[in-house]
Amino acid sequence: MRVSRYFLPILKETPREAEIVSHRLMLRSGMIRQQGAGSFSWLPLGKRVLDKVCQIVREEQDRAGAQEILMPTIQSADLWIESGRYNDYGKEMLRIRDRQDRAMLYGPTNEEMVTDIFRAYVKSYKDLPLNLYHIQWKFRDEVRPRFGVMRSREFLMKDAYSFDLDYEGAKAAYNRMFVAYLRTFARMGLKAIPMRADTGPIGGDLSHEFIILASTGESEVFCNKDFLDLPVPPADVDFTNDAEIGGVVSEWTTPYAATDEMHDEAAWAEVPAEKQLAARGIEVGHIFHFGTKYSKPMNAKVTGPDGQEHFVSMGSYGIGPTRLTAAIIEASHDDGGIIWPESVAPFDVALINMKVGDAECDRVCEELYAGMTAAGREVLYDDTDQRAGAKFATADLIGLPWQVIVGPRGIAAGEVEVKNRATGERENLPISAVPGRFGARR
């Protein structure tokens, strides 16, 4: 893609309403535009990142055995009345009526609808376990939306829902999602720490929030530093092996970790002082087992091996890709701008022509653009006539992992300069070696 043809509305000044780093950088880099309180349009650069975040989420959900569906944003109030949540849900839920005066709502979540789908088709334990997920826009009328897409009213969510015959099956499903989440965040360059969360009136111990450490985090967190060195499950982890998956979960839940709401001073005191880490954190995912909370009132049951009917045991598993995009920026930026992990970067390489109009600079840039693209890399070619300093500032701001800088002096020596955005390291490469230096996206 050529910058001269790309819709990239860079802002030179930081908008006054932006309170945190991710909000400032997303606005300045032209990723998003605010349309109203807690409502944003995703512009081309931001949409590319969002799509890549969603793709990683999909790949790991699929790997863990979940199946993607798509449910509508507008739901019938009847389902929520049936579950008992319609009157319990507060003003966060947007309630509407259609032209037939039927009560509808803009879904803030999808437990009722997915349970309705399940009960319509699944009647036997032989069709279990089942895990269905979708990625869809949600709306919650937040009292005070703030921090950009970190706490907005309209947001994108991946919601997965598991259905099992009994608690043991539900726990195995929970563990699979636990491991899938570890892999998901690691692939985005994040170290997410699972922290025990409140299970509310349902009770039990199957509820975890996944927290990344960031100075701008909303929550105060306490954890054992051992988490920082724990290995992430590999791509070939066997999701069909409950013992293997359970072992990973045990390893990741043994060290102490808690948000301030769940913090236990007595247990914290048992952690060696040199291993205690108190910091701020951002929630990027939440998994939760809720048993028969919805299956009972909505009569979602299957015939078990004993010939009796059983209400299915359910769990829900949420990741917000829009929020997650902002969280990645909070965890990976510097004074110059965003530093994207390669897996979610909107483009791999910023190709910078230092002297547009110079025949040799133009020729070399065109050759490199074609060569890197043919090698499988996504290249954003700055072919504009802006001064060099402005081009460098833009490249740093939007945070592409690599910058390839082409100028007359380097061409005379048969070289171009390559800069690593994350480390700042620079090297000179022969022009002919550049396409090979950037193989296909990993």
UniProtKB/Swiss-Prot annotation:
* Broadest EC class assigned to this enzyme: ligase
Keyword Nucleotide-binding: yes or no? yes
Q: Does the keyword Acetylation apply?
A: no
- Which EC numbers characterise this protein's activity in its record? 6.1.1.15
Q: Which GO terms describe its cellular component?
A: cytosol
Q: Where in the cell is it found?
A: Cytoplasm
User: What Pfam families does the record point to?
Assistant: HGTP_anticodon, tRNA-synt_2b
Q: Write down the superkingdom of origin.
A: Bacteria
Which chemical reaction does it catalyze? tRNA(Pro) + L-proline + ATP = L-prolyl-tRNA(Pro) + AMP + diphosphate
* One of the record's GO molecular function terms: ATP binding
| InterPro entries attached to this UniProt entry | aa-tRNA-synt_IIb (IPR002314), aa-tRNA-synth_II (IPR006195), aa-tRNA-synth_II/BPL/LPL (IPR045864), Anticodon-bd (IPR004154), Anticodon-bd_dom_sf (IPR036621), Pro-tRNA-ligase_IIa (IPR002316), Pro-tRNA-synth_IIa_bac-type (IPR004500), Pro-tRNA_synthetase (IPR050062)
Alphabetical UniProt keywords? Aminoacyl-tRNA synthetase, ATP-binding, Cytoplasm, Ligase, Nucleotide-binding, Protein biosynthesis
PROSITE patterns per UniProt? AA_TRNA_LIGASE_II (PS50862)
GO BP of this protein: prolyl-tRNA aminoacylation
Q: Note the subunit structure.
A: Homodimer.
Q: Which PANTHER family match?
A: MITOCHONDRIAL RIBOSOME PROTEIN L39/PROLYL-TRNA LIGASE FAMILY MEMBER (PTHR42753), PROLINE--TRNA LIGASE (PTHR42753:SF2)
Q: Its family? A: Belongs to the class-II aminoacyl-tRNA synthetase family. ProS type 2 subfamily.
Q: What is this protein called?
A: Proline--tRNA ligase
Q: Which gene encodes it?
A: proS
